[in-house]
Structures are given as structure tokens and as C-alpha cells.
């Protein structure tokens, strides 16, 4: 295992400036994956960085069920945690990083494969309900309902509902426009028709949330 301080700065993205810089990384590729993810999370507007589990509970206490945020994990074995308000209170779900991808912690008794993603934002978006302008559709334009996922906590089986992120900062107008465009680009063909500078700008944050 190697730590962030072992990696040279040359040719790499901006070093981590959150509590994650004290974490241990298994490889340079994992370090780069986390650096790229942090950069996108910092632009997302709902990354709360060093907020603790207790502080996340306070932040979400007055919010409706389905409100969520991303923060740094207090567990040294993990990088990020998804804190979400449920009907049973706030639940903290570890986001696991393994084999160059992220996944949400699952019930160890389950034999079902866990969805994996190369970015935390894509992971979060996967568990959110489909919007009218995106998502797979049935004939006639109706959206296919997404599969229901469950949280297993303290013996409870709770449906995982991610409705809206809790904002940690005000997004720029440019970023809001980028998210809107990302939500409407549902095919590679549409992306290739865009001018190169716009494609590059969208690639820097390729999520609709």
C-alpha cells in the first residue's frame, strides 16, 4: 500500500486538499481516480468534504426523506460516504473503491452483483429516479421504472431513495447549464455533433446532477 505523499506531482492532477490526503491508496491509478472524483465532487455543489456523520445527521435532520450529501468517510478503509435522510432517520452508506471503480456498500448476504462506476457522481445518479428528459423509455414515451434498492441497517430493510442533493455551495450559471445539457445528451451521436470546446467542457463534469 502507498500513500498520497509517495506520488510525484509531475503529470498528475492537483493534489488532494481534503482529509483524503491522509488516506492510503493501493496504487497510482487509484490515487488518480480519487483525485478526479474529488475534482468533480467539488464542482457538484453537494460535496461536504470533512463533515462528520454526526454533523451530516444535523444537516439532514430538517430535510425531507430522500435528501442526501456526499462527504469524506471517517473510516480509513474508505474514501467517501453517502449520507441520506430516510423515513427512519439519516443513514450513512460507505462508498467502496475497488478495482478502479466505486460501488455502494451492500448486504453481505446478498448474492446479487453490485453496480459499479468509475465516478461517484455516476453512482449517485444510478440510484436516483429517472427524470422526464432522461432514462430508458417504454414505447409511447413512458419511463421504465428503476429497480428498488434497499439499505440494511440495524436489522432494518429500508428502501434507498435519493431525491435531491443538499447543496453545500452555490453553483455557477455555467455549471447549471452544463448539468442541464448532460441530462439531455442521451446518445454518443448527439455528443459528437457538438463543437470541440463544448465537448471538452462537458467531459470535465459528465453527470446531470
UniProtKB/Swiss-Prot annotation:
One of its GO terms (biological process) is intracellular signal transduction. InterPro entries: SH2, SH2_dom_sf, SOCS3_SH2, SOCS3_SOCS_box, SOCS_box, SOCS_box-like_dom_sf. Phosphorylated on tyrosine residues after stimulation by the cytokines, IL-2, EPO or IGF1. Residues 161-208 form the SOCS box domain. GO terms for molecular function: cytokine receptor binding. Residues 34-45 are annotated as: Extended SH2 subdomain (ESS). It comes from Gallus gallus. Residues 22-33 are annotated as: Kinase inhibitory region (KIR). CDD domains: SH2_SOCS3, SOCS_SOCS3. Interacts with multiple activated proteins of the tyrosine kinase signaling pathway including IGF1 receptor, insulin receptor and EPO receptor. Binding to JAK is mediated through the KIR and SH2 domains to a phosphorylated tyrosine residue within the JAK JH1 domain. Binds specific activated tyrosine residues of the leptin, EPO and gp130 receptors. It comes from the Eukaryota. Keywords: Growth regulation, Phosphoprotein, SH2 domain, Signal transduction inhibitor, Ubl conjugation pathway. This is Suppressor of cytokine signaling 3.
